[in-house]
Amino acid sequence: MTQLLLPIIYLAFISLGLPDSLLGSAWPTMYPQLGIPFSYAGILSMIISLGTIVSSLNSDRLTRALGTGRVTALSVGMTAAALFGFSVSGQFWMLCLWAVPYGLGAGSVDAALNNYVALHYESRHMSWLHCMWGVGTTIGPVVMGAALSGGLSWNSGYRYIALFQIALSAVLFCSLPLWRKRPDAAPDGTVPKALTLPQVFALPGAKEVMLCFFCYCALETTAGLWASSYLTLVRQVPAQTAASFASLFYIGITVGRGVCGFLTLKLSDDQMIRLGFAVLGVGIAALLLPGTQVFALAGLVLVGLGCAPIYPSVIHATPAHFGVQHSQAVIGIQMSSAYVGNLAMPPLFGVLANNITPALFPFYLLVFLVLMALMHRQLVRKTAHA
């Protein structure tokens, strides 16, 4: 059953990434056709993020009641419906309505699948599965670009991705008997407990892992959003070169996770996390070096490579840190804190850059790296004695 389920889970992780990059790639075409301000993309992004936060916080109870297979199939079906809704929408308010199931579906499947893989598969699969998420985020804009360059509308790009999600949802529903044969209980037979939020927060190390995830996602999203502007405005890198290296940041994360899958054969999750911190530190230091642009460009790629092992390794270590009976609940709050970091921290840097200077970019990343490293150290210490 393990070998039969694994390809389905890989496909599910690709499907998680497909919608994540669609809005950004389609928005330059969408907003003039809809007759709305450019900034309204932030409203849609906020609605989607709030939906993912809500569903992540409730993923523990949902997964306990329905099982990982049903939650995954229903959630992918929900996102498929939302994407199809986007494809037939001609007004902004319609997009806002469809953004609600879009976010709710994404949060539930993210938390449920991550916990299932952490319980049942080796660390290398967690790295490779998150690499597949990166593949999905790469395919999404390619599909949208192909639709637009072929003379079709942005609605068609969303429709193509929706059809893929609908097909995957059908595969997931057909695979439900496989999930039943591989129950959500851990290999030792331990059944996860449903916990209230106060009970989760009271677990030793829970606050630390939440802050660790918050800082990681704040750093990753801020770097991805503002790196090109920093290179252009502060380091005088030509705009085209800066844009290319900004894309290499995400390629670095995706390729890095593929490589990290092999490194996990020799290194533990906590060692992989510390390795990521070290590479991140070198990358941020390179961004700070004055003079030649080469250091800044290389630093950005290193920041992407440093990010690669952290997210999947923190998730995979959750059952070891908190116990398999608590892992689903803890991963749910990890996901929600990650989305809060994604939602709040990149705009905050925009305010700082606008009112002070964009040269604060590497220092802003450094604050999150230091805090993340401190929280991880506290997490390991507290859970070792729990």
Regions found by a protein language model. Give the residues of each.
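Extracytoplasmic gate region of multi-pass secondary transporters
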Residues: 23-24, 204-247, 251-254
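Interfacial helix-cap and linker-helix signal at transmembrane-aqueous boundaries
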Residues: 30-31, 62-63, 143-152, 231-232, ...
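Conserved MFS/SLC helix-loop-helix module at the cytosolic interface between two early adjacent transmembrane helices
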Residues: 54-93
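Helix-to-loop junctions at the C-terminal end of transmembrane segments
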Residues: 55-67, 256-269, 353-354
